[in-house]
A protein has these predicted regions:
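Nucleotide/phosphate-binding sheet-loop regions of phosphoryl- and nucleotidyl-transfer enzymes
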Residues: 1-232
Length: 232
């Protein structure tokens, strides 16, 4: 954040969200630890056939270690796992146009750790199914209605109306159903490798910059496509 003063237009490099978070951190406000992948990386991503190059991947690993130390949690740890949110950060807000992924870092093993850590199995399983649904939709391209239909059918079978009436075992069953629908629609398994999850989520946010809805929004609001987005 000390380096922020040296950047002439931080929003151009870090995006609106990243620049504001960095500024708040510099002021000593209580901001959750994190890091921003700059708009320059977005440009490199598209020039590199829509892939993150090895230098960027290594830098992400370094920043992740710094974050782990600051929160005393480890990404993928089986006792106290670090969970991440991956969000877009254009220099001008584009509400609802770009993709976000929450609870990243959950898999079949870390969800058990989260359950033990929070003493709340229902919360842990619900968080995991939300992540699988978000990841399946945003990263793997499975339309959201497939997941919603599974939930509605499950509630009908159980004879309940609200998601809050589903318990830990119910969400456990739906987690399996969600994985099956991902496999059925994509012919790929939902990834258990959490670093693969992270890199794919970052790539998905960069790709959402060129989604149809984002292009239309930019056209209507005269936002240049070459600006790109940061990732927070």
């Amino acid at each position: 954040s000390k380096e922020l003063k040296k950047i002439k237009n931080p929003k151009n490099i870090l995006g609106g969200k990243g620049a504001n978070l960095s500024e708040m951190g510099r002021m000593g406000l209580p901001v959750p630890p994190g890091f921003t992948i700059s708009t320059d990386v977005c440009d490199l991503f598209y020039k590199n056939k829509k892939k993150l190059n090895s230098k960027i991947v290594n830098q992400i690993k370094i920043e992740l270690k710094v974050m782990e130390k600051s929160v005393n949690k480890k990404f993928g740890d089986l006792k106290n796992p670090l969970l991440l949110s991956v969000r877009s950060g254009a220099r001008i807000s584009m509400p609802g146009m770009m993709d976000t992924i929450l609870n990243l870092g959950l898999n079949d093993k870390t969800v058990v750790a989260l359950s033990k850590r929070t003493s709340n199995g229902r919360f842990a399983k619900d968080s995991y199914r939300r992540f699988i649904q978000m990841y399946g939709n945003v990263v793997m391209g499975v339309e959201n209605h497939h997941f919603e239909e599974l939930i509605e059918n499950y509630k009908l079978t159980k004879g309940v109306l609200l998601d809050t009436e589903l318990d830990e075992n119910d969400w456990d069953g739906l987690i399996d159903d969600f994985k099956k629908v991902i496999k059925d629609k994509t012919h790929k398994d939902f990834p258990q490798d959490i670093f693969e999850q992270l890199l794919s989520a970052i790539s998905a946010v960069f790709l959402s910059w060129e989604s149809n809805r984002a292009k239309i929004y930019r056209k209507l609001n005269q936002i240049p496509s070459e600006w790109g987005t940061a990732v927070n």
